[in-house]
Amino acid sequence: MRVDRPRAVVSDPAMPHDPVRHLVAEVERLGTRALPYAELHREITDRLRQVLRIDAACWHGLDPDNRLPTTANPVELLANGFLTPQTEMAAARSVLASEYQRPDVNTFAALAGRRLPSAILSETTRGRPERSARYNDFLAPVGPPHEMRTVMVTLERAWGCVVFHRTAASGDFTTESSWPRPAWPNCSAATSPPTRP
């Protein structure tokens, strides 16, 4: 049975980058395939990598009523050696503490309330990522110090998010390098519940 999903706003015709238009179309197409979440996330990340350098992606599910995490998929962090089974729980505790127990920047709840629910850690901290507790006890020690977060919002409800990481060797995310941001609404619509396996 097919359930219609909320339709995202297609990118503005004046958008200067043809690759973004192509990316939006690809994400919309993926959204019609009813793929399991893990496979869909991998497919979207693979397409984003065609226009954006990403060393690791970590997708999360959020409860739209309270914005608490319901799932995490750190498979790329583990596969690329940034996390191990022994350090995964400590990293998860650090991320959760920054979301709900201590002040930090670019929390999922804060991003969900923005017009564009996406932010780069170094931009928010004005070039001083050490202002972030999450950076000090997770990102810097683990090895992918550069972070860009995006919350998936559909019909004003935040139900998921993705964190993109870069190593020091890859360089930081910048406004210029993150120009696929206009595709985020389409990512939200393509991956939104309720019929995803």
Give the positions of each predicted feature:
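Actinobacteria-biased recognition of intrinsically disordered, low-complexity terminal regions
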Residues: 1-20
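Regulatory input/activation interfaces that engage signals or partners
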Residues: 12, 16-18, 25-171, 176, ...
